[in-house]
Amino acid sequence: MNLMKKYLHSKWTSIEKLNGWRHYEVRNVFINNKELEIFSICDKKNTFRVKITDINDNSKWLPGWEEIV
């Protein structure tokens, strides 16, 4: 499957708050490095890279925007 299509603009919820936020969207896919550039929906300046293996780890990330209480 084309990684660009699978991950680009996908939405994710972080189990733990990162820089104060949980809800992120994929802005860029770096296929060679197997990394995603994600940004916080509430603070678009809050961006960083995440390994694709980490984003698929359900103990760290959930697909979509989920409410975590």
Over which residues does each language-model region extend?
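Intrinsically disordered, low-complexity, charged/polar segments
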Residues: 43-69
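Exposed beta-strand and adjacent loop surfaces of beta-rich binding modules
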Residues: 9, 23, 35
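Short coil-to-beta transition motif at edge beta-strands of beta-rich domains
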Residues: 2-17
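Short coil-to-beta-strand transition motifs
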Residues: 15-25
